[in-house]
């Protein structure tokens, strides 16, 4: 396992130094399209605030997938076209949405009752940091004012499966895939998979970011430089299909 150790060591040294990457970043829309490929037929799915909400526009045709929002919606459709927005229909991120036939609207108490009763099969969240053991930090930066943690803590404690969709490095050029989260945690050992503009990863048994797919045009060397935690690479890595 010497090769794995070396990859971990290189990544750790990059955490507090800006990473100068030369690849073209994939858009949030493209990441959302890749996440949508992992949603199974019949799943009840919560879409977190931010980029995860874009997944609604990329669900596979012909599959019945029920989207949930913690402000009290079940059965969301794609975003409305320009000029067709209804200001009374919004998701938890205050974005205008559409409702599919048979959709339901209810209060937050019922919505969180669904979450805590583990009726949600999959949650897709953004994050500021994810650790190599599947810990997630996505609600607070010390010293900055926040309104509250929102529904993320309930979701990570109750959802059966959690996928994180996020940029792999922050605005300072520092990796967000870490050995250990430095920001206040939202949940511990709960993340199963991560999709970034560089690739797709799963949390390996025993810890580590197992690289499953690389984004088109992105090399494994680039990914190593942008990963601060333990990166596991084997011969089965393939290119992401978008």
List the model feature ranges, each with a label.
Residues 19-100:
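N-terminal active-site beta-alpha-beta segment that forms phosphate/nucleotide-binding
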């Amino acid at each position: 396992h010497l090769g794995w150790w070396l990859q971990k060591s290189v990544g750790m040294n990059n955490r507090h130094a800006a990473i100068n990457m030369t690849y073209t970043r994939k858009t949030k829309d493209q990441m959302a399209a890749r996440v949508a490929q992992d949603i199974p037929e019949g799943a009840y799915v919560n879409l977190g605030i931010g980029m995860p909400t874009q997944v609604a526009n990329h669900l596979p045709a012909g599959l019945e997938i029920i989207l949930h929002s913690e402000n009290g919606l079940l059965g969301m459709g794609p975003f409305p076209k320009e000029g067709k927005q209804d200001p009374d229909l919004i998701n938890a991120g205050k974005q205008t949405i559409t409702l599919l036939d048979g959709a339901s609207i209810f209060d937050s108490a019922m919505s969180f009752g669904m979450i805590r009763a583990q009726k949600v099969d999959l949650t897709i969240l953004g994050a500021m940091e994810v650790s190599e053991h599947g810990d997630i930090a996505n609600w607070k930066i010390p010293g900055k004012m926040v309104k509250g943690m929102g529904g993320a803590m309930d979701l990570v404690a109750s959802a059966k499966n959690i996928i994180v969709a996020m940029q792999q490095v922050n605005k300072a050029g520092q990796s967000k895939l870490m050995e250990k989260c430095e920001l206040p945690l939202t949940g511990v050992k709960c993340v199963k998979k991560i999709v970034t503009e560089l690739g797709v990863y799963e949390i390996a048994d025993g810890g580590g970011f197992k690289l499953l797919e690389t984004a088109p045009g992105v090399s494994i060397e680039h990914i190593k430089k942008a990963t601060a935690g333990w990166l596991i690479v084997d011969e089965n890595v393939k290119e992401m299909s978008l």
